[in-house]
Amino acid sequence: MRFLSNLVNGLGLGSVYAIIALGYTMVYGIAKMLNFAHGDVIMVGAYAAFFALTKFNLPLIPGILAAILCCTVLGVVVERLAYKPLRQASSLSVLITAIGVSYFLQNGAQLLWTASPKMFPAVMSGGALQFGDLSISYITLITIATCLVVMVCLTLFINKTKTGSAMRACSEDKDAARLMGINVNQIISLTFAIGSGLAAVAAVLLCANYPTITPTLGSMPGIKAFTAAVFGGIESIPGALLGGLLIGIIEAMAKAYISTQLANSVVFAVLLIVLLVRPAGLLGKRMTEKV
């Protein structure tokens, strides 16, 4: 029974990682860049939801929508101001810029709201379902269900809509997409908007499970979600889901059966082993370069 309890907890944690990983996957798949400031967008989403629910006394759903709107706007602004001028720049320049944006958001949050922790309000039910000796909290069930709904909606959007087709075209060949009349810059901005909106959803779910908010809130979840995206295949949306769930389960099991202090090391060690065997990730495609 302890194993099942840890498995469910791992699925709940992994669902948060999966939602965050979808942001990494979409941005890399279309813009071919790694947005290492993505974790700090989660932090901004957490603060936005916190103030919407406590200072403005909004109900839960409007509060979440306010956080999503805030992060969506932030994602577009960051893309336009920081990343758009670097379209033709080297990967190193983009990486340095992403790290700079990350530090800017962290220090900006600390300047505005101080480093003192803030407690996210208990807006979701604290009850649990009982299956014999197994207890599953409603928050965990909501987290898992939200992840699945997000995954299905995003997959349908990418595969069944005209905008989704444009995104797939940009992912395959931006120059060809331009010749077909697709506004590539607009598609990239939309991708950042969607990824940042998902970061806000993940922020609320993360704070519902771990209610302490600080300016560094998004750092470790962001790193683990990036690990999940690489684990599953950085350009694969199903891979982001699979990677997130597996990383969550591995972390939960490592905490339960090995050591809480070593759990992160175990997660990254498993990632290295997988990449040695499958460099493209579990569901990633091997890329062949024509000479």
Protein language model regions, located:
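Membrane-embedded helix boundary and interhelical linker motif in transport proteins
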Residues: 8, 30-77, 81
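Membrane-interfacial amphipathic/re-entrant helices at transmembrane-helix boundaries
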Residues: 1-20, 48, 58-63, 89-93, ...
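Hydrophobic core segments of alpha-helical transmembrane domains in multi-pass membrane transport
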Residues: 46-50, 68-74, 99-107, 146-155, ...
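Transmembrane helix-bundle core of multi-pass membrane transporters
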Residues: 56, 85-160, 187-190, 211, ...
